Amino acid sequence: EVTSFFVELDNATQSEWVGELTKRITVHEDTEVSVCILDTGVNNGHILLSPILKDEDCYTYQKEWGTHDHDGHGTKMSGIIGYGDLQTLLENREPVELNHVLESVKILPPTGKNEPQLYGAITSQSISQVMIEKPHRKRIICMAVTSSEHTTGDGRPSSWSAALDELASGYIDEQQKLIIVSAGNVYDWDNYPDTNIVSSVENPAQSWNALTVGAYTEKTLRDLKKYNNASTVAPKGGLSPYSTTSVIWDDKKWPVKPDIVLEGGNVLKDSLGCVQCEELSILTTYYKPFERQFDTIWATSAATAK
């Protein structure tokens, strides 16, 4: 099936698909491996997320923010981090064994924005909070949050990227950490790939010590007639139209970023321009499961979650 098939089902039918999948899931709850998601919070009431994200593993930088997902992004990240290719799992009948659990720290406020000079401190304190609560876990830290407004544009460090470098190195606490961060996104697709080449990886993904994830794509359209013979912007196996790069940086001074690329989806193009398309995105979990179970995710967020 195509991604849009699952997204367009009514909630009752989506719930049946999810219910069938849950019967095949085994979560090894004694695992010490966790993925800590720094984002908008996660709504772990979703039937696919509740077995792998306990209430006690949901944190927030500011108590008054709550731990819930006010935006949807954190829950979309969780579906991919928890299950990988969710669509493939739905389409087959194989047992699913999960050897990791999730943790969530809400680092973005429900209203307004954090002060830019606090980005590094918020990230550092949020990671420390989780490590203090569950010090025994083997933890991967995942953050698909970047700032285009406060990007140096040429690879130079910022206070935020420096904080990631310090955290990853274990300079303060002598505990090295795997921190995975998204490269940041491009939304001017008409001039692909020229725009991607001149669009800098965003702050704080210029961090030397973090693993920066960009996006490529294998996504193509099976039935172009459905879209009046439109085409995809990127070729199969090419750089995703969403991905920033470090081509314009001085590679004698600064790192080459992103470090790796994973599936981030493609974009549809016709005579009128470019547009996002569900079939060229990745299926994941929706943050309001009483309305529907599935949503789609794309760009370097999807790639980072992979």
Annotated model-derived regions:
Residues 1-10, 179, 214-215, 223-224:
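Basic/polar, acidic-poor N-terminal "presequence/leader" segments
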Residues 1-26:
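Autoinhibitory propeptides
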Residues 18-20, 117-132, 233-248:
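A Trp-anchored, charged/polar loop motif used as the substrate-binding/catalytic surface
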Residues 22-25, 66, 91, 129, ...:
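Generic recognition of flexible, low-complexity loop/linker segments
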Residues 24-57, 64-118, 152, 174-176, ...:
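Subtilisin-like serine protease catalytic core
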Residues 39-50, 200-305:
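Extracellular S/T/G-rich loop segment that most often corresponds to the catalytic His/Ser-adjacent loop
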Residues 62-76, 156, 293-306:
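Gly/Ser-rich catalytic serine loop of serine hydrolases
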Residues 108-209, 217-220, 291-298, 302-303:
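Substrate-binding/access-modulating region of protease and related hydrolase catalytic domains
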